[in-house]
């Protein structure tokens, strides 16, 4: 079943074939990127028009988003975009450190030449976008965050754990929602951190790569907390 309204989102480049999946991805995208602000009441009638989906599809989608933590469901009041808080952000960042650093160590130790090639390509795309951001061109902020996501995913893709990759994706998207709320660029500091992680990973120094990654996430957390 196809839907003419289905469009690729930042974190999901290709349109999906089912209405339910595409509706889930599009609403999640709009929550992450602030089109649906924290605390917004999600009224089914309005969503039906916005996303060209049936009420039954929307209920299923909102329940799935609630199980992933992007939507809150309150008895008698319906669905809301999950509110944000500094404590929640700190918890998400700490969980991301635990999971992503472990996955990175596994990936560095297991990765083959295809993994190396994918990592080089992902870092190249991110590096070019960071140069654009540094020059003052901020017209492609969503593309910048896509390349950031693709780089972090490329780092850990060889961890050989589908479950770990799925859990990491949810944490990364939750963390990204906070970043998009403040949407400030850390500049050379973040770019250098990415290069340090990249260099350590290619050198197959799993412990150094994990340390650099933890520093990177921690610095990003402090930056985002200060901007909230």
Regions found by a protein language model. Give the residues of each.
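Conserved amphipathic alpha-helical segments that form helical-bundle/coiled-coil interaction surfaces
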Residues: 113-180, 191-199, 208-218
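Helix-capping and short linker residues that terminate individual alpha-solenoid repeat units
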Residues: 202, 221-222
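Short helix-capping/hinge motifs at transmembrane helix termini and TM-loop junctions
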Residues: 108-109, 160, 184
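Short helix-capping and inter-helix turn/linker motifs at the boundaries of alpha-helical repeat units
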Residues: 18, 142, 187-188
């Amino acid at each position: 079943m196809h839907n003419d309204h289905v469009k690729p989102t930042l974190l999901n480049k290709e349109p999906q074939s089912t209405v339910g999946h595409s509706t889930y991805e599009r609403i999640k995208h709009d929550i992450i990127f602030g089109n649906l602000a924290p605390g917004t009441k999600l009224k089914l009638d309005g969503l039906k028009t916005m996303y060209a989906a049936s009420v039954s599809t929307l209920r299923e989608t909102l329940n799935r988003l609630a199980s992933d933590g992007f939507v809150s469901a309150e008895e008698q009041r319906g669905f809301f975009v999950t509110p944000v808080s500094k404590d929640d952000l700190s918890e998400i960042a700490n969980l991301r450190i635990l999971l992503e650093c472990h996955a990175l160590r596994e990936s560095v130790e297991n990765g083959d030449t295809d993994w190396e090639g994918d990592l080089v390509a992902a870092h190249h795309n991110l590096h070019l976008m960071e140069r654009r951001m540094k020059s003052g061109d901020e017209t492609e902020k969503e593309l910048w965050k896509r390349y950031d996501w693709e780089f972090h995913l490329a780092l850990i893709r060889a961890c050989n754990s589908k479950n770990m990759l799925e859990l990491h994706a949810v944490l990364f998207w939750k963390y990204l929602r906070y970043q998009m709320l403040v949407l400030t660029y850390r500049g050379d500091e973040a770019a250098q951190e990415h290069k340090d992680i990249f260099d350590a990973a290619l050198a197959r120094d799993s412990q150094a790569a994990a340390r650099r990654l933890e520093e990177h996430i921690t610095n990003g957390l402090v930056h985002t907390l200060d901007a909230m």
